[in-house]
Amino acid sequence: MLTKNELKSTLKEVLSTQATSYDYQDTMEYLVYKAFDLGADDVDIDEHDNIYITKGNADVYPCVVAHTDTVHDIYKGYKVYEIEGNFVAYDSDSMKQVGTGGDDKVGLWVCLEMLRNHDNIKIALFSQEEIGCVGSSQARKTFFDDVGYAFECDRKGNSDFVQNSSGVKMFGKKFKKAIQPI
């Protein structure tokens, strides 16, 4: 288990990658490298640049999903700093604060930490979400055949747990209690 400072360091590392919906190759290379570094058994990239990661051998896997792009521009002088417990990014060329791409880099970080901490897990990382869910709409459905449940961590804040989709309750109290340790 990583310490709080180590977790912050890995989050800063992920936030330091830059990606837009049209320029995300560096982030993809970083994610593939990290996946193997964290013990992934298989990493596959489809024709839509979605990344599929499998670790372990299970009849049924938990799955975590995120997306690889952000709405922010790419800056040559981009650097992430921690200030009073918050991560901020600055472009040294313009000397202005810029976005960190927390949407969905925090989701990518969660995926990597789940990969680090679980022996059997699947992860799907979708491309071009910010321009209309391009990658996820073309997802390889067979990747999910042996997935028991999936988490998506693309949320504002941390005070809620979405249990409904389009007015449909997705699971009950028993499931929520079972996944609480995660």
Describe every region a protein language model picked out.
Residues 4-90:
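Acidic/His- and Gly-rich active-site-bordering loop/insert found
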Residues 2, 16, 60-64, 76, ...:
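N-terminal catalytic or cofactor-binding beta/alpha core of small enzyme domains
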Residues 1-3, 131-132:
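Mixed-charge, polar/low-complexity N-terminal
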Residues 1, 37, 177-182:
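Polar low-complexity intrinsically disordered regions
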